[in-house]
Amino acid sequence: MTDDFFKITDAIDRAALHSTFLKGLIDRQPALVEAIKTGNFDVSEVEEEMPVARRLRLDRRAVALTVAIGDLSGLFDLTEVTRRLSAFADRALDIAIRTAIAERTPDAESKGFAALALGKQGSFELNYSSDIDPILIYDPDTLPRRGREEPEEAAVRIGRRVVELLQARDADGYVLRVDLRLRPSPEITPIVLPVDAAISYYESQALAWERAAFIRARAAAGDRALGQRFLDEISPFVWRRGLDFGAVREIRAMSHRIRDHYSAGQLFGPGYDLKRGRGGIREAEFFAQIHQLIHGGRDPS
């Protein structure tokens, strides 16, 4: 037996002892546990004949357990943990998009609909409990749709089905929490944006915080060529080579709003919120993003 075997079995024992959630996964997936003991961290109990929604949820359970054991055993470093969790989110989102299109137009090619990963998913930094914040876009000219259906109507129905596949809960849990509020004016805009209108908006009307949202963006799922075309088109907006006084004032105002929103007067001491308190994780993150917005257009490094 190798050193890795003892590290893995010890990690499984500790997980079962100290985590109710992981103990439940271990008890429900004995075959998966035995595979992990052999060093196979890419194993899954998914069967092809299963409904897609169930396959996704079982795949999510397998990823949660394999990554946790790899993490606890020391065989995965932090980069590998977040990479695997982010790669799963990409894969699940892609499957959900293709399924939603195929359910409505079985004979059509799955194209014309893309998901852009932002934030931690965009930079392959998802953690165990992260939700995802994609922006969904579509091409009216290539999106498959039924009969007399308008492109926007088809896109919104596909988008709703994607969210349903990922968020619906049953005895197997759920796949991912999905937050679509990073799109422009989410209270009045459809959940899926036509690509040309989205490009026009970001080129002419978007605010500094919307630029910041795209710092880590990438085409993650669906029609990736469409997603990449969109990102290429708005790149000059995100990474400006020059800033006028209005842009500087806007960035400064964003910085002040962030501090006011997250710090809430909190100082170090009992009850301090490490994530949202003054000088905490969120404020440090936005500090870095502000400097990226200022300098990134002239210094890509």
Where do the protein language model's features map onto the residues?
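A nucleotide- and high-energy phosphate-metabolite-utilizing enzyme signature
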Residues: M1-S301
